[in-house]
A protein has these predicted regions:
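Residue-level marker of positions within ordered structural domains that often coincide
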Residues: 7, 15, 137, 172, ...
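Sterically constrained small-residue positions within well-ordered secondary structures
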Residues: 11, 16, 35, 112-114, ...
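Bacterial Sec-dependent N-terminal signal peptides
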Residues: 1-27
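Generic hydrophobic-segment detector
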Residues: 10, 104-105, 455
Length: 555
């Protein structure tokens, strides 16, 4: 009896020791055989009760926000994710199902890792082949991710034969630092909400407009947050930009719905430079005719479209075109057509960084329409950390913008290309400009069969009198966006209006800029000229071209 009791005591004692043992495992990552030295090693603390997955930088509390720590509770295999969004802001979310849903093909292959006998299991996730090497020698389960936690202790994971995370050291420790990192109770949220908050914490969002109306009505008035001009077709808000560092990317995003207007309309997102004595804002407040006039010799006057010594035109961030009646006219039924409810427009505008960083600017949006219901839009500008540096320019110089943003306040359509002179701008550089580019956005308009909207026309750009670039702007993919266009008219030939190819735009899309290389420009006076063989008018129908140009480079 005494010996049996003694045996049970020692068995229980050894079990408690095993239960209390905590291992610390370090892992390194590699890609195509090269160790990713810039990546902090993965760190795992594991015992029979729970596992924690983090990195050495997180352990040292030197990691940039946001970052995550993963906890696996045993024996339930519940995954608790902790997101550190910013200093003092931590959230968590439990997941009791994901580990149990994992499936593996167990193989007979074996190998040794750090002296431990390991077996291989294989799984596929989102078309990726994952090989997991695990051991049962440690008598506990764990690993550098949640993958394979039910197999044993994972010491190596290989993805698609080119990406590898492998254990480099294993040791027993008496205690961990986890209580110094996760302190006290942490608020919990559902998994979808957790992922959304974590994702949004990875970048900076500047909220410009939230479900604002752009319409045509005498009742459209400014308020303390948003200014409205031209009977509500233009909305403006002053936005303070933070310092935007090298390597950070900037995106503009618009979400648009019809609020009564069924037609495809020209839209633009712009900002107003205030680097000269006169700006586009003066025209909004005092009238278009207070802005500098451009005369091409056709008898018309075009206000505020070209830069002068004392005036900078509005800089176009994004040109977009509304779809035919999205959301408001989704009651129109066609068999096999499930209409989209929102038109999303999103564009990288990182090249404009030098004119945005640490500036307080008027940001505006315009949709040309004469409808009292008009359109609803939301506008965000987001700033993202990135290792990708595509645009290295430190200079942004606005040269021209012929899009008649103040159309409903008397600004004429851009029909100046009916003369050979076209658009002509003179500008002066105070310093040499290296790697100069013209950021050029162009769309042709005139919505009848012979109008320039539906007739390809060459755009030719001349620098200091010499043609430097010529191309035919044309979009032939408009039919791809049919489901955004419920109110698009249908023709006897089986096509719909939104299917038709156009001069560089489609209903429901963004028009991308062209980046035209100009080489190195010396300090002094230069000229830019744009020529387009604009089609002749027919009765009351006429063609026009909306072109905007910004000079980029480094000084």
């Amino acid at each position: 009896m005494y010996k049996k009791a003694l045996f049970n005591f020692f068995a229980l004692f050894l079990c408690c020791i095993a239960y209390a043992q905590t291992y610390e495992i370090q892992y390194t990552s590699s890609s195509n055989g090269k160790v990713l030295t810039e990546q902090s090693p993965t760190l795992v603390w594991a015992n029979a009760k729970e596992n924690f997955i983090l990195t050495n930088k997180i352990r040292e509390q030197k990691s940039d926000y946001p970052y995550e720590i993963t906890k696996v509770e045993k024996p339930s295999n519940t995954v608790v994710s902790y997101a550190f969004l910013k200093l003092g802001d931590i959230i968590s979310s439990p997941d009791a199902e994901s580990i149990g849903k994992q499936s593996f093909e167990l193989t007979n292959e074996t190998k040794k890792i750090l002296g431990y006998s390991c077996k291989k299991a294989v799984t596929k996730i989102n078309s990726n082949t994952i090989e997991v090497w695990y051991t049962n020698d440690l008598k506990i389960n764990g690993g550098p991710s949640v993958l394979g936690q039910s197999l044993g202790f994972v010491l190596e994971i290989e993805r698609n034969k080119n990406s590898l995370i492998t254990a480099t050291s294993i040791k027993q420790v008496k205690k961990t630092d986890i209580n110094a990192i996760i302190k006290g109770s942490v608020p919990s949220t559902d998994l979808l909400g957790y992922r959304n908050l974590l994702w949004k914490s990875r970048f900076t969002t500047l909220k410009v407009f939230d479900n604002e109306t752009i319409n045509f009505s005498d009742e459209s008035k400014s308020n303390e947050n948003v200014k409205k001009f031209a009977n509500g077709t233009i909305i403006l808000k002053k936005i303070k930009f933070p310092a935007i560092k090298e390597g950070e990317n900037i995106f503009v995003e618009v979400k648009q719905q019809s609020n009564g207007d069924a037609y495809d309309r020209t839209g633009t997102v712009f900002f107003i430079p205030q680097d000269k004595t006169s700006s586009f804002f003066d025209g909004l407040e005092k009238g278009a005719k207070t802005l500098p006039v451009y005369d091409n010799g056709n008898g018309k006057q075009y206000y505020g479209v070209t830069a002068t010594e004392n005036y900078s035109p509005a800089i176009e961030m994004m040109r977009f075109f509304t779809a035919f009646g999205i959301q408001k006219f989704n009651h129109i039924q066609l068999k096999g057509k499930d209409w989209q409810t929102v038109s999303p427009y999103r564009q990288d505008i990182t090249e404009l960084k030098p004119s945005l960083s640490e500036k307080e600017l008027w940001i505006g949006a315009f949709i040309g329409n004469y409808d009292k219901g008009g359109h609803k839009i939301s506008l965000d500008i987001t700033i993202h950390k990135s290792d990708q540096t595509v645009y290295k320019n430190n200079t942004v110089i606005p040269l021209f913008n012929t899009l008649n943003i103040m159309e409903m306040a008397g600004q004429d359509y851009s029909t100046m290309f009916d003369k050979d002179k076209g658009l002509f701008v003179e500008f002066t550089l105070k310093k040499d400009l290296k790697n100069a580019q013209l950021r050029y956005i162009t769309t042709g308009h005139g919505g009848w069969e012979n109008g320039d909207e539906f007739v390809p026309k060459a755009n030719s750009v001349f620098l200091d009198g010499k043609m430097t670039f010529s191309f035919v702007p044309w979009r032939s993919d408009c039919g791809s966006y049919r489901l955004y266009n419920p109110a698009s008219g249908n023709f006897p030939d089986g096509l719909s209006s939104s299917d038709l190819s156009r001069s560089n735009w489609c209903p429901g899309t963004v028009t991308n800029p062209n980046f035209i290389p100009l080489g190195d420009l010396k300090a002094g006076t230069h000229t830019i000229q744009v020529k387009i063989p604009q089609g002749a008018s027919e009765g009351t129908s006429f063609s026009s071209w909306n072109v905007s140009g910004v000079l980029l480079g480094s000084q």
